Regions:
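Acidic, glycine-rich A-domain
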Residues: 1-146
């Protein structure tokens, strides 16, 4: 959807391996979204327990140089350290980055619960999704509000 709209975007993914945060650049901004990027993204398993504040801290240097308008996080759970996430969200906002999130759950109740937790952390905009095919429309709604 974003590629069709000619929106300049990058895709990063992260999880934990042996209690260490691992971040991947799935699609750099100068590359078009393609099957290769989709396959790279699909190979990354969601295994929970990701320290979101640590991930955001690692990405801060990238965001400082790229200065995106919006940073969109898809989350399927709660961060390990809510207070640390709140602090780093403030840092990102001070750079002029609109912090948004989509809570992804297995059903409407869990998606809404995840989204409510994300809203409590201080994201500028939060949405809930329980059906993966709904994600493109949710992303569009975030972009249209910007």
């Amino acid at each position: 959807v974003l590629a069709f709209l000619k929106v300049d975007f990058s895709v990063y993914a992260f999880n934990t391996v042996d209690r260490q945060v691992v971040c991947w650049l799935v699609k750099p901004s100068e590359m078009k979204w393609n099957n290769s990027a989709a396959k790279r993204l699909a190979q990354i398993s969601a295994n929970g327990g990701t320290p979101l504040a640590e991930v955001y801290d690692r990405m801060l240097h990238v965001l400082t140089s790229k200065k995106p308008d919006i940073f969109l996080t898809l989350s399927d759970g709660e961060p390990a350290d809510a207070n640390a996430v709140k602090l780093i969200l403030k840092s990102y906002r001070s750079l002029g980055i609109k912090m948004t999130a989509i809570g992804v759950g297995r059903d409407t109740f869990s998606a809404t619960s995840i989204a409510n937790n994300l809203k409590y952390l201080g994201y500028d905009k939060v949405l809930a999704v329980s059906r993966l095919p709904d994600i493109p429309n949710r992303v569009l709604s975030i972009l249209s509000d910007n």
